[in-house]
Amino acid sequence: MRSKLEVCIDSISGLEACINGKADRIELCSSLELGGLTPSDELMELASEINIPCRVMIRPKKGNFEYSSKDLQQMFRDIDKTRSYNLDGVVFGATLLNGELDQEFLDELIRHSDGIKKTLHRAVDTIPKTIEAVEIAINLGFDTILSSGGYATVMEGLAVLKEMQQRASGRIEIMPGSGINPQNISEILSDSHFTWLHSSCSIHRQNSKITDSQTIKEIKTAINV
């Protein structure tokens, strides 16, 4: 079975590019330049009207992934909005000052997300024990881990990602993301089958980055080779 492509977007034009490029799934965000924050209600509503599954970034503030009880309540509200729009799922992560995943906080979010899909985002790449996090994510109840293997890009962390895939043993999806493009797909998929790949599929235009439907098509073509 061929791999599928999830595209992260933060605008209406990004939604349109995903439709035109035939993305398999969307990660819905705002402020991708900050690593992705919770999207607006407007973008969630528009996403609910298209025929592509969407997972919603639940990240109320920029910076690190350490959160307060006030943040937790805001994240609960954003999860409720995701559910109200009948979107596919949510994407979140949380860490402690000691560099470990905040399992207690994540458990609260997981419980509040009952009935929809849950992705552990790249907060997992900020902790020292990225590989060991696979078992933690499984036990917490995540469906997917988005990761670059603890490195800046998937190509740098590919060996770690393949070890994470072996650890997962089909119990959770390991979804490589960061720096994926049409040129490196074959190397990423050699020796390991990742069910999902994650990319912004963006190009530079007038001092900014935009989601590009042609790049989506090129990555999907490379996947099918």
Language-model-derived ranges and their functions:
Residues 3-7, 26-28, 47, 54-58, ...:
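Hydrophobic faces of well-ordered beta-strands that scaffold small-molecule active sites
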Residues 62, 86, 136, 168-225:
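C-terminal alpha-helical cap/extension of soluble enzyme domains
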Residues 10-20, 66-79, 125-140, 161-166, ...:
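Catalytic cores of alpha/beta
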Residues 44-81:
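Structural motif corresponding to the early beta-alpha repeats
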Residues 26-37, 81, 85-97, 142-155, ...:
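Glycine-rich phosphate-binding active-site loops on the catalytic face of alpha/beta enzymes
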Residues 1-26, 31-38:
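N-terminal pre-domain/capping segments
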Residues 20-26, 50-53, 85-89, 112-115, ...:
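Glycine-enriched alpha-helix->loop->beta-strand junction motifs that scaffold or abut catalytic
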Residues 13, 32-53, 70, 95-114, ...:
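Active-site-adjacent beta->alpha loops and helix N-cap segments on the catalytic face
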